């Protein structure tokens, strides 16, 4: 399970929403082993007054926050990050200089999903990869 928030300027996200979502989810499937149907993305478009960033970033500056179950190896998470950078550049023209990715891991017992704590769910995919 991964819940992903994507922050950027309204106009940028509106133009590239589908491509960004596809790039991130393809990377999550390849690196993290998420199933195709487990796409949980929230786009948070901001006005320029509400999204302040350094001058060495362009108007394509995009912040990606990933909340997911703990259990994946350091190498798996690094692979995911690298794949997201590459996919956003290839599919969306968003250069790595304009992307920041943060991963926050949470024990499954701290998630509630479909009426139960997540550590009581039977998953259709592996987390310990």
Spans of model-derived segments:
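Interaction-mediating elements
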Residues: 1-129
